[in-house]
């Protein structure tokens, strides 16, 4: 039975014999019948075993059949030749004699014996051979038509006939047979050769036997019947009739379907006709076909060239749906040839393999991003749904994207699950907050609020919230914002703002539209001190005039004060085309008529100013740094400010010029830095740049409130101190032009103004240039790396290092970040700090999302302000050649620089604060730690640095901290007033009638600043200095630092008691950090204020139920004074245990 099963399987295999499925079925049925016992079972068994070789080999069976048929035909021809040979010779001799006699009588054509007398019977001898040849032609015609319909190719049949002719001639020449014999022996040889060739050429046995047998029979008939021709020519006449018959059959095959309708289904034989006819045949298409079948069909096509596919192609029918595809292809759809389908099982298996790979937490982020993209594509195709893909705009180029898209995508979207080791290394309080349900209300406070939107599985489900109730979940009424919409994690901005990076070196006008929409908040009301603060509140005695600018500074402009302003198209406009917009006034941001220069802008009404945007004005355009309702913006007062700072006459009032109708209108006179470029009366204050508590408000008073030059002046001093002008050959005028235009773009709002940008820039510079105890440096000599070649100016490849001229190292146990971060990355960090809040409207991301601001719609509610800051600042840089201070960077360096700046700006979004902190902690707690040779590690350090600099207010001294606190409180109250006017719920801590300033700052320090400083210091990156126990911190310059040292004697005693057994062999050294000391001091101050407020209100017993605060005795997760044994590396520090938040 096993042998019989193998025989059945062999018969089912496709081969040259091409056994049909019906034949295999009959064979299987016969085998199943033989399995039953019978009286003659032994004989049947032996016969089956004898026929096994024939059944297994289709080639052998076909050859046996062809050979048997050829032998029978040869014997038949030999028998006919032997019996009729003598009589035929006699009849031929008699016929020849009669023909000679008739010829002698004058006859032209011989006639048969017994012919009719007269001339009419002279043509009768040729009727018989003509009729015979016509019969042969018809026979071969029907045979050819049958073969063509069955799928046999025409060249194959013609080649068989050619082989027959060649075999015929070969036999005649080799045997030397004369013309008087019937060629019985050559006939047998020719038949054998023809049958063998046919067996080898023909694809299927049934068709091969039919063709060979039919050809042999017709050849034999022609050999016997054509008596009027020579014996040697008779086979060739038969072959000629065969060729003509096949050609007629091919012609009939072409014209028959057009006349009689669609033919039955058949396989293709290599012509365009077959492909065209096949499209018209109704039938079921196979959905799954192997690649070999597809390749066989494509290789057989000779009329149309197909591309060679290395991967399976998805047919358009599957992508668009059969009905839609039939509609789109129209009348020419039948000419598309054979459609190629995809094996869904293979795609499903590939999708499963990729899913298994994504489960591995050790994969790099860029690899995970690529695998996830492929998985999404496969899962989309596996659903078999109609997909409508929009066409890509051919005018958009994707060749200029930065080169770090993969790593950038991985850095932006932390979708990998946190490993067990990382979860063990993180404190429970941080794990409780690392969740998508936490967000922040502003980049200044970062207070956590509950997100009402559903959790996105693909973005934040990898980190589960802790089981402990969150502070916001304890008392939801305290937040007072049930309907506040918050944001989700954002993608990288750079993919939505594709700009050719090569244009940065072209000193010409760049005619390209910007992709920026406009934020139009209401004008800020006058600053007012917080109401309801107790008498002991640290901000109760502060004046509200500390933050610029007061409403009195705003000057009403006349009709002649309008200036034409650069505007860009905010978003792709789907509305019908309208006439070109009129010139935009920079004072009010609205178009005005050019016909009457004396007419001023339209008057603003109160209700119109409360609208966040205007959707009815489709022709309205904006600048990069100006909005609709920015009457208090700094660029409005540009003329007056320049007149006061530069002591130049005020610009004459003139009507706005006339411009041609173009897509873009550029300023004829851009905002340029006034003379002198560097103010010389600021040296006394600029000498204090190397102190953490830099008197930035005193600097603002010396420069002048209205000038707005504080950012450009400080930027120039810091770049000059670092040697970046020489390292990168930065032109000073272009540098000052851009930074002056950048600071003009900052609005005069209480907190997010140009003073805040300058403070963040100074903090970043301080954190990267000041000595850090125990930090190893990549290079040994810090001075040698900053030397630049006089020819090249800078080592291209951005791996050179620069150091501050104020960097004085007392010994080799100090280091600084600038010694580990290349100069190009360091300069990108400084530029990002100057750009990071450009054109900030004074409103939070949640407010823009809740009011459906154009920027929120443009950036899909994700990092709205951060994306706008980066886009607007870069658009300003690329708008004028006068701003291009990076002209000496090559193409690769510029793209990398732009990538680093954008990444640093997007990192300031506190919606992703906990993700950054968790990732940084995992890197620090790793065995390897921070690898300064790895660009991704350096980028992460720079992102943490700018994040700490952005929220450094609580880490400053008390005086500066209170100034910044008043500014953010005023900005919050302005947003609360606008929310109340718009009928929106007032956001937490923004209700002017119920101030909670102390709670705001205490929660901000506890949840945001404290853990961030702790993580930054645990990596050994916080500036400080070694302090011996015997020094008693007497060398500190700040008297507050001495007071702070005296306030914590118990901590020192605890540390000394814990290390008492080791004092005999080691000398202990402490690390003093001024930043952390200020943070601890301010945190304790706000907790005391909360206690005093509770005592005044008589709610001490209910404080824990109303406000989620810590006990005053608890310490925040910040840095205390650390100690280290002399001679040990900093990695071996023994820190006091800190409580988890």
Swiss-Prot record:
Biased composition (Pro residues): 522-532
Region (Interaction with SLFN12): 669-1141
Binding site for Mg(2+): 837
Residue stretches of biased makeup (Acidic residues): 1029-1046
Highest taxon of source: Eukaryota
Record-annotated membrane-spanning stretches: 62-82, 127-147, 157-177, 182-202, 207-227, 229-249
Modified residues (Phosphoserine): 310, 492, 520, 524, 533, 1033
GO terms for cellular component: cytosol; membrane
SMART domains: HDc
Phosphothreonine: modified positions: 1036
CDD domains, A to Z: HDc
Biased composition regions of type Polar residues, renumbered to the chain: 472-483, 618-637
Record-given protein name: cGMP-inhibited 3',5'-cyclic phosphodiesterase 3A
Organism: Mus musculus
Lineage: Eukaryota, Metazoa, Chordata, Craniata, Vertebrata
């Amino acid at each position: 039975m096993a042998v019989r099963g193998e025989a059945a399987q062999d018969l089912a295999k496709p081969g040259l014999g091409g056994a049909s499925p019906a034949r295999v079925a009959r064979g299987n049925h016969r085998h199943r019948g033989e399995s039953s016992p019978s009286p003659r079972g032994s004989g049947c068994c032996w016969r089956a075993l004898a026929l096994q070789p024939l059944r297994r080999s289709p080639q052998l069976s076909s050859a046996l059949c062809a050979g048997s048929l050829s032998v029978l035909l040869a014997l038949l021809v030999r028998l006919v030749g032997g019996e009729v040979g003598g009589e035929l010779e006699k009849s031929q001799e008699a016929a020849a004699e009669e023909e000679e006699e008739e010829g002698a009588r004058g006859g032209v054509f011989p006639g048969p014996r017994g012919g009719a007398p007269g001339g009419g019977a002279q043509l009768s001898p040729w009727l018989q051979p003509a009729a015979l040849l016509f019969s042969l032609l018809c026979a071969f015609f029907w045979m050819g038509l049958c073969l063509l319909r069955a799928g046999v190719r025409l060249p194959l049949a013609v080649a068989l006939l050619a082989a027959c002719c060649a075999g015929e001639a070969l036999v005649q020449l080799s045997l030397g047979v004369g013309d008087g014999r019937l060629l019985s022996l050559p006939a047998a040889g020719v038949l054998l050769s023809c049958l063998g060739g046919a067996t080898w050429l023909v694809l299927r046995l049934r068709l091969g036997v039919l063709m060979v047998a039919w050809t042999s029979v017709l050849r034999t008939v022609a050999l016997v019947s054509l008596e009027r021709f020579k014996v040697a020519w008779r086979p060739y006449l038969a072959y000629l009739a065969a060729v003509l018959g096949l050609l007629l059959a091919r012609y009939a095959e072409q014209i028959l379907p057009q006349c009689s309708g669609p033919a039955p289904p058949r396989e293709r034989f290599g012509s365009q006709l077959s492909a065209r006819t096949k499209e018209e045949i109704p039938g079921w298409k196979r959905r799954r076909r192997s690649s070999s079948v597809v390749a066989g069909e494509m290789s057989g096509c000779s009329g149309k060239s197909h591309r060679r596919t290395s991967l399976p192609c998805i047919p358009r029918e599957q992508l668009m749906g059969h009905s839609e595809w039939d509609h789109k292809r129209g009348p020419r759809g039948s000419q598309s040839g054979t459609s190629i389908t995809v094996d869904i099982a293979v795609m499903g298996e590939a999708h499963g393999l990729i899913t298994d790979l994504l489960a591995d937490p050790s994969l790099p982020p860029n690899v995970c991003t690529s695998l996830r993209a492929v998985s999404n594509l496969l899962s989309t195709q596996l659903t078999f749904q109609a997909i409508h893909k929009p066409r890509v705009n051919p005018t958009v180029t994707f060749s200029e994207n930065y080169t770090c898209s993969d790593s950038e995508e991985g850095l932006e979207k932390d979708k990998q699950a946190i490993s067990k080791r990382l979860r063990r290394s993180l404190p429970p309080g941080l794990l409780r907050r690392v969740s998508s349900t936490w967000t922040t209300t502003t980049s200044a406070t970062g207070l956590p609020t509950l997100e009402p939107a559903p959790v996105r599985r693909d973005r934040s489900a990898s980190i589960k919230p802790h089981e402990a109730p969150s502070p916001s979940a304890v008392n939801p009424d305290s937040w007072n914002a049930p309907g506040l919409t918050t944001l989700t994690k954002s993608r990288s901005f750079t993919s939505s703002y594709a700009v050719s990076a090569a244009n940065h070196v072209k000193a010409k006008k760049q005619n390209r539209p910007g992709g920026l929409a406009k934020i139009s908040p209401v004008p800020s009301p006058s600053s007012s001190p917080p109401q309801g603060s107790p008498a002991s509140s640290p901000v109760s005695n502060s004046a509200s005039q500390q933050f610029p600018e007061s409403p009195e500074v705003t000057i009403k402009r006349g009709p002649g004060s309008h200036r034409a302003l650069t505007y860009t198209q905010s978003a792709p406009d789907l509305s019908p085309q309208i006439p070109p917009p009129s010139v935009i006034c920079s004072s009010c941001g609205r178009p005005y008529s050019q016909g009457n220069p004396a007419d001023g802008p339209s008057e603003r009404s109160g209700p119109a100013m409360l609208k966040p945007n205007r959707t009815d004005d489709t022709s309205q355009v904006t600048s990069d740094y100006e909005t609709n309702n920015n009457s208090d913006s700094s660029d409005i007062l540009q003329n007056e400010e320049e007149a006061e700072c530069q002591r130049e006459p005020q610009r004459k009032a003139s009507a706005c010029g006339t411009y041609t109708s173009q897509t873009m209108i550029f300023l004829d006179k851009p905002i340029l830095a006034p003379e002198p470029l560097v103010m010389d009366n600021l040296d006394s204050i600029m000498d204090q740049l190397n102190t953490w508590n830099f008197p930035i408000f005193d600097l603002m008073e010396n420069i002048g409130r209205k000038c707005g030059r504080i950012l450009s002046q400080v930027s120039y001093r810091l770049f000059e101190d670092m040697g970046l002008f020489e390292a990168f050959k930065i032109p000073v005028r272009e540098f000052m032009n851009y930074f002056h235009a950048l600071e003009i773009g900052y609005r005069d709002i209480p907190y997010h103004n140009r003073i805040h940008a300058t403070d963040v820039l100074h903090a970043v510079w301080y954190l990267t240039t000041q000595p850090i105890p125990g930090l190893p440096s990549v290079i040994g000599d810090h001075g040698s790396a900053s030397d630049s070649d006089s020819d090249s100016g800078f080592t291209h490849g951005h791996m050179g290092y620069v150091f501050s001229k104020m960097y004085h190292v007392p010994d080799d146990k100090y280091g600084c970040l600038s010694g580990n971060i290349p100069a190009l990355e360091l300069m990108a960090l400084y530029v990002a700090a100057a750009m990071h809040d450009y054109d900030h409207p004074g409103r939070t991301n949640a407010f823009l999302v809740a009011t459906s601001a154009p920027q929120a719609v443009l950036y899909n509610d994700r990092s709205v302000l951060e994306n706008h800051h980066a886009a607007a600042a870069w658009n300003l840089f690329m708008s004028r050649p006068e701003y291009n201070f990076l002209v000496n960077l090559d193409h690769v360096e510029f793209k990398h620089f732009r990538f680093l700046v954008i990444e640093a700006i997007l990192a300031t979004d506190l919606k992703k604060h906990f993700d950054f902190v968790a990732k940084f902690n995992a890197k620090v707690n790793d065995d390897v730690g921070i690898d300064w040779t790895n660009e991704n590690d350096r980028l992460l350090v720079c992102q943490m640095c700018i994040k700490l600099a952005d929220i450094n207010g609580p880490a400053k001294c008390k005086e500066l901290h209170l100034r910044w606190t008043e500014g953010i409180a005023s900005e919050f109250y302005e947003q609360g007033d606008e929310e109340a006017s718009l009928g929106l719920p007032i956001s937490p801590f923004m209700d002017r009638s119920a101030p909670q300033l102390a709670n705001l700052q205490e929660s901000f320090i506890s949840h945001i600043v404290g853990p961030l400083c702790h993580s930054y210091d645990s990596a050994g990156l916080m500036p400080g200095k070694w302090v011996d126990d015997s020094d008693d911190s007497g060398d500190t310059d700040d008297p507050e630092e001495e007071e702070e040292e005296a306030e914590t004697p118990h901590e020192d005693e605890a540390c000394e008691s814990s290390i008492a057994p080791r004092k005999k062999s080691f000398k202990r050294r402490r690390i003093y950090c001024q930043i952390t000391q200020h943070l601890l001091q301010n945190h304790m101050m706000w907790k005391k204020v909360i206690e005093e407020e509770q005592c005044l209100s008589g709610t001490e017993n209910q404080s824990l139920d109303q406000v989620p605060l810590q006990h005053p005795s608890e310490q925040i997760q910040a840095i205390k004074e650390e100690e280290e044994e002399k001679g040990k590396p900093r990695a071996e520090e023994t820190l006091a245990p800190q409580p988890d938040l």
